[in-house]
Amino acid sequence: MNDAPLPRGRHHQQGPVINATTSTAPHQPAPAAPDTAIRPALRALSLGAGVQSSALLCLSADGTLPKIDIAVFADTGWEPKKVYEHLDRLEREIAAPAGIPIVRVSSGNIRNDALDPNHRFASMPLYILNQDGKQGMTRRQCTGEYKIKPIKKKIREILGYPYPSRVPKGVFVEQWVGISTDEFHRAKDSGVQYMHNAHPLIDIGWSRADCIRYLERLGLADTPKSSCLGCPFHGNAQWRSIRDASPSEWADVVEFDAAIRQGNARANATGNPLLGQAYLHRSRVPLSEAPIDHVTAAEWAALRQETGAPDAEDLETGVVDGCSPWACRGEQPEPVRDDFGLAV
């Protein structure tokens, strides 16, 4: 769908701050103190179309939270069909009636870029089996390139200071990020002065479970996790869901998994080949052969020892909250390198 018209930067109006000091003149009210607080030019939502960010959009649309001026969805070009369908529904049924524009931004197609020898590729966190049999991972750069970068670019444009213009001090956007109380430790700032991250779900004391119940009441119980179709942080349950519910998408990820076995095309073309083999699944076997079906407790124990999974729940559920630009749950559990060579 086409991007809705963008709001120009403006300051939100709030009531004056009243000086509560007792007046020295009898029967005279204390004068209002000057309102010198620096306010955001506008409020924006980092919309991943997962549970928490969807809940924030709905809470703003129904008036429970202040109205946001814009929601920005960073499209990696390889989101599951369920995410695109859910995003369309949010725009049609929630955002548009409330007058909240949803803008879609992109830095390219992460799948195509990985297989294009002429394109710089920001690496995905692939599971590596080194030539000496040791295990490792490639460094996660995809969130910065395909999520954070296009959002920052759009915010600069909205403020009227596109790169490389300098954004004046004091000009900033209040950016809402979908972090709930059960993951408050993930809350962090944006790293740039023109975007101040806010976490309204923490402010109102909502957990992920609260968000799910709220979305269920709105008829949005099928809100998906927000992550790339072929995200290596998927758990077995997510891989099974793709395989069983969407054969075409399963064929897509199986094909991609095989295509990146020797590393990304750009690295190979420039003489920096992967010194090992890359896989999408933690087991470090081809995705078409990976043990993604439910197994017994004894099998869990054996598989956990074999794959190095910290626990069976992680292997099954994967990244619980999907991929958020400023709060990716994909912490590096194993040694990495910046390049796409040997993971040590």
Put a short name on every predicted segment.
Residues 2-344:
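Nucleotide-activated chemistry modules centered on ATP-dependent adenylation/adenylyltransferase
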